Amino acid sequence: MAAAAQLSLTQLSSGNPVYEKYYRQVEAGNTGRVLALDAAAFLKKSGLPDLILGKIWDLADTDGKGVLSKQEFFVALRLVACAQNGLEVSLSSLSLAVPPPRFHDSSSPLLTSGPSVAELPWAVKSEDKAKYDAIFDSLSPVDGFLSGDKVKPVLLNSKLPVEILGRVWELSDIDHDGKLDRDEFAVAMFLVYCALEKEPVPMSLPPALVPPSKRKTWVVSPAEKAKYDEIFLKTDKDMDGYVSGLEVRETFLKTGLPSALLAHIWSLCDTKGCGKLSKDQFALAFHLINQKLIKGIDPPHSLTPEMIPPSDRSSLQKNITGSSPVADFSAIKELDTLNNEIVDLQREKNNVEQDLKEKEDTVKQRTSEVQDLQDEVQRESINLQKLQAQKQQVQELLGELDEQKAQLEEQLQEVRKKCAEEAQLISSLKAEITSQESQISSYEEELLKAREELSRLQQETAQLEESVESGKAQLEPLQQHLQESQQEISSMQMRLEMKDLETDNNQSNWSSSPQSVLVNGATDYCSLSTSSSETANFNEHAEGQNNLESEPTHQESSVRSSPEIAPSDVTDESEAVTVAGNEKVTPRFDDDKHSKEEDPFNVESSSLTDAVADTNLDFFQSDPFVGSDPFKDDPFGKIDPFGGDPFKGSDPFASDCFFKQTSTDPFTTSSTDPFSASSNSSNTSVETWKHNDPFAPGGTVVAAASDSATDPFASVFGNESFGDGFADFSTLSKVNNEDAFNPTISSSTSSVTIAKPMLEETASKSEDVPPALPPKVGTPTRPCPPPPGKRPINKLDSSDPLKLNDPFQPFPGNDSPKEKDPDMFCDPFTSSTTTNKEADPSNFANFSAYPSEEDMIEWAKRESEREEEQRLARLNQQEQEDLELAIALSKSEISEA
């Protein structure tokens, strides 16, 4: 501050009366000092960030008094001008030549709206930017961006409140895309470090913090801007930062454009309508003029967003609608002279009134200190409340995290338990797989053996079929030979019969005896006829057998062992009929294989001891089949043609897994058929069926089976999960003991047995069927509470303050609720909607004795209004005292002069 103290007011202001004007606007009451609140409000109009303004205040107010003198205020203005022109904010910059500062002030057109955004240097220094870039790269950005999840831990490490961190994120995310690039991350870290240094975070991002890459481009290029700035400095002769229409008239007319077009360009560039153009507006006007002259592009009817000067973009909505006259700088100089004289007089007067001023200064200082302390206490109390709220939030968050930790531990235990179970299951499955693999290998070996056995049996079958075919081939000529022999025998027998008839006829002619005898024996004609009929029957039977054997469906039958009949040696008629009596006429078969067997065609003549009595012999007086059965010696009845089955000893497919059968048949092992409709069962089974009707009304008790062997499915489903309790109706109530539709009752007792369960079922329905549930009654809706203004205030019934209406007393006035209130334990879901006693609703949760929310709001409003009135009264009193003091001082000065 020593360097600043050496500079005079003229050196600080560079002879520009604007500094004096700014001072007079802020300094009120001719006290010679600028209060901190007034100076802060005025300096914020410069558009600089709060961080830079705070630094400027610290450099100006070196003593930390909280007030600025005139010289200190000029130093602050000079530093503001340095910051607006991109110079370093330090005391060494006071000696540099800079234009006067510019402030946002709608009362004067001479004050610009602040520096150009494009001209402002970035507040983030290069060394800080390098440090922030290193942090940015350590977070592993994706495509040059960091998401909120990656930036959040870095911001939380600063230990700043969540509200401030949220504001930092909103300010740094300039693109509002939910991600931060390298420049945006640098802005965020810059704001975080500023907040850690107890500097306030702005509500909106200052222009100086906007990265150059995020600043909108202007249609006027930097080269054009530099050229137009030189023209502007030559035109702005009063150095107030603006050019009027008179100053630029000649310059614009030299372009050769029509006056109407120049007027349109002037109206477009004069965005504030103050009749003057700033440096940026002047550059835009010349840009539009050159576009028309060089490219022939007419100016637009209104400015596009990229045409708006950067200095006017922030204050575009605050356009100035009126113009004000140019300030009279000569009058300002005279006022400055008078002010210097007054200062000299005040210095002389200070020697006389030094004690009084020191006391007043002490009082004011103490007052300001007290006020500062009060403000500090208020701020600290607010911070304490915020910290307490944050502490509560952290505690709640910690509790939630503890709960989540407990839940996760439980889930972890469950998962570990499940993993152990799964591991055990896997081990058991592996063991089962190993056993199954061993079984499969054994089954494969058995299958190979079975296939070998099958191939062997197939070969044996083929051999047997070949032997059968060869036997058939041998049988066919034998059968044919047999037929021929039978035909010859039948023809021979016919010839013998005819011969006998002729002989009988001849004998009847000459015989006179009553009992004539055949010439060659005692065999009569009936025996011959019998033998002939037997021969005919045998021929028919042989033909039928030959026809059956010739069919292809009976090729597998075994070879029949038939007697081979050789052609008999038939003697002539003289040899066939012999003279000796009672001899048998026997056809002979000369086959070696059947020589010892009985001849099926041997006809034994009946022993007729008596001769024919009469010549008129009746051959049908006696039954020729009484003595013997002609078919008792059937050669084809003793041998089974299918007895030689080659596969009856073993099943060639027994080892195949697809033809295996269980060792026990579930439908044959049971002793009784449970589905048999026969009525030969005992009365106990009938009664059991009658008592075990699962479909009777109300359900019946299904008695357990007395004998487990009667279950036809026990061998199949005995070990299954549903084998014991599948379709088990044993849990039903015991109501009906008889089944009216029992199919096992015999017809003789069905009427009595069916009539009885029907009567018993009717009785059981009326006695044991459970009653139906009562209909559900909806819960009565809760009555709406009375409005706050109409709440009844209950008076105390008792003088005892402890015996108030307890809203949570469940049994008012009863000592033993169990005895005196029988409805206490009643069913709350019964259909009855009326109760013996109705509870008083006013006794439940009665908070009418306390003030309502509306009353509290009204009280808060009254208190805030009262405090505001007191504050305004104090301010008015202070202003009145200052005014009286100023009047007294001016009167004393006038009287002395």
From Swiss-Prot:
It comes from the Eukaryota. Sequence repeats lie at residues 599-601, 623-625, 629-631, 634-636, 640-642, 645-647, 651-653, 665-667, 673-675, 693-695, 711-713, 806-808, 827-829. Ca(2+) 2 binds at residues 236, 238, 240, 242, 247. Residues 667-685, 744-754 have a biased composition (Low complexity). Changing residue 864 to A: Loss of interaction with UBQLN1. PANTHER family: EH DOMAIN (PTHR11216), EPIDERMAL GROWTH FACTOR RECEPTOR SUBSTRATE 15 (PTHR11216:SF54). This is Epidermal growth factor receptor substrate 15. PROSITE patterns: EF_HAND_1 (PS00018), EF_HAND_2 (PS50222), EH (PS50031), UIM (PS50330). Involved in cell growth regulation. May be involved in the regulation of mitogenic signals and control of cell proliferation. Involved in the internalization of ligand-inducible receptors of the receptor tyrosine kinase (RTK) type, in particular EGFR. Plays a role in the assembly of clathrin-coated pits (CCPs). Acts as a clathrin adapter required for post-Golgi trafficking. Seems to be involved in CCPs maturation including invagination or budding. The modification Phosphotyrosine is found at residue 850. Interacts with HGS; the interaction bridges the interaction of STAM or STAM2 with EPS15. Isoform 2 interacts with HGS and AP2A2. Part of a complex at least composed of EPS15, HGS, and either STAM or STAM2. Binds AP2A2. Interacts with AP2B1; clathrin competes with EPS15. Binds STON2. Interacts (via its SH3-binding sites) with CRK. Interacts with SH3BP4/TTP. Interacts with ERBB2. Interacts (via UIM repeats) with CORO7 (when ubiquitinated at 'Lys-472'). Interacts with FCHO1. Interacts with FCHO2. Interacts with SGIP1. Interacts (via EH domains) with DAB2. The EH domain interacts with Asn-Pro-Phe (NPF) motifs of target proteins. The modification Phosphoserine is found at residues 108, 140, 323-324, 467, 470, 485, 561-562, 748, 798, 816. The keyword Aminoacyl-tRNA synthetase does not apply. It is a peripheral membrane protein. Residues 852-871, 878-897 form the UIM domain. Residues 599-829 are annotated as: 13 X 3 AA repeats of D-P-F. GO terms for molecular function: calcium ion binding; identical protein binding; polyubiquitin modification-dependent protein binding; SH3 domain binding; ubiquitin binding. Residues 528-607, 667-692, 741-849 are annotated as: Disordered. Residues 585-599, 758-768 have a biased composition (Basic and acidic residues). CDD domains: EH (cd00052). Residues 15-104, 128-216, 224-314 form the EH domain. Signal peptide: none annotated. The gene is Eps15. Residues 48-83, 160-195, 223-258, 262-292 form the EF-hand domain.
